[in-house]
């Protein structure tokens, strides 16, 4: 059987690997970290963990599980995917892998702005997921950091729970509708004692905020998709219910396809993509 190469070893990629390798496929998973999940601390909305589970522990357990079943984990990044004589050529800085099928599961890359203090307050006011953490900021004042459609989308999620939300574009011109409340000043730093308390701007002024939701840029999978000629909608890869793209042998799962950016959904996507990629390989 031809090899299956999975790009991304977050929940979607590892879930796909578990199903494919158990079905007899040789599987290589390429990734540098656990994706967007690495920005989380305690996961409190995942089935079976009544007291929550640390994101780091969940990522590491999934990787060990896949390795124990025989999947190869390659810590690297994908430079490109090309069409080979039979199948695909997946290029990394160190090697080129031949694959009969490929699953793109790198998720949506989140660009972290270079703002002093942003790392200090991750988990203490700074969040990367509105739908995950909006609940904890009810009755408080929060900012969304970003200037595009992703920032506007996170704003709408937050406004369903929080009344006081402002988008801070960090000096960039917004591409979302001007009717959304926003501030275009360049951000100098985040400040606070034990948690985020204020945003200080480059002009010396400041504004109090209890939380900041980072929503800069968009997808990492998008560039791979466009180079391959995959159909996209916005910054998402278009798939059918089998997580198959418009190119036979290429599948996509997780945050890079439409739907909620949640662990449970990513695991489900991976299951579907892994089983369907296995069927595809067996048909070759």
List PLM regions with ranges.
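Beta1-alpha1 glycine-rich phosphate/pyrophosphate-binding loop at the start
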Residues: 4-60, 65, 140-146, 150-174
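Glycine-rich nucleotide phosphate-binding loop and flanking beta-alpha elements
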Residues: 13, 110, 151, 207, ...
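Glycine/Thr-rich phosphate-binding loops of Rossmann-like dinucleotide-binding domains
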Residues: 37-38, 112-113, 153, 209, ...
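Short loop/helix-cap segments at secondary-structure boundaries that form the rim of catalytic
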Residues: 39-40, 114-119, 135-137, 173-180
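A Rossmann-like FAD-binding core segment of flavoenzymes
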Residues: 63-85, 89-91, 97, 160-236, ...
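FAD-site-proximal beta/loop scaffold in flavoenzymes
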Residues: 114, 120-136, 217-260, 265, ...
């Amino acid at each position: 059987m031809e090899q299956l190469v999975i790009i991304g070893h977050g929940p979607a990629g590892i879930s796909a690997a578990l199903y494919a390798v158990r079905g007899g496929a040789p599987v290589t998973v390429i990734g540098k970290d656990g994706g967007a999940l690495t920005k989380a601390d305690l996961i409190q909305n995942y089935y079976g963990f009544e007291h929550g589970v640390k994101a780091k522990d969940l990522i590491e357990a999934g990787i060990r599980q896949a390795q124990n079943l025989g999947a190869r984990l390659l810590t690297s990044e994908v430079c490109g995917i090309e069409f080979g004589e039979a199948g695909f050529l997946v290029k990394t800085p160190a090697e080129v892998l031949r694959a009969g099928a490929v699953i793109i599961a790198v998720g949506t890359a989140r660009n972290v702005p270079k703002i002093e203090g942003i790392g200090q307050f991750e988990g203490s006011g700074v969040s990367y997921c509105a739908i995950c953490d909006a609940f904890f900021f009810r009755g408080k004042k929060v900012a969304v950091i970003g200037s595009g459609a992703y920032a506007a989308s996170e704003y709408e999620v937050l406004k369903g729970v929080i009344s006081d939300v402002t988008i801070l574009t960090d000096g960039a011109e917004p591409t979302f509708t001007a009717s959304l409340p926003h501030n275009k000043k360049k951000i100098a730093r985040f400040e606070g004692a034990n948690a985020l308390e204020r945003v200080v701007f480059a002009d010396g002024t400041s504004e109090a905020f209890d939380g900041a939701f980072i929503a800069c840029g968009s997808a990492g999978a998008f560039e791979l998709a466009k180079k391959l000629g995959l159909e996209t909608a916005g910054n998402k890869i278009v798939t059918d219910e089998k997580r198959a793209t418009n190119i036979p042998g290429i599948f996509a799962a997780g945050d890079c396809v439409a739907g909620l950016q949640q662990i449970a959904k990513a695991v489900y996507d991976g299951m579907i993509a892994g089983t369907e990629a296995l069927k595809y390989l067996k048909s070759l």
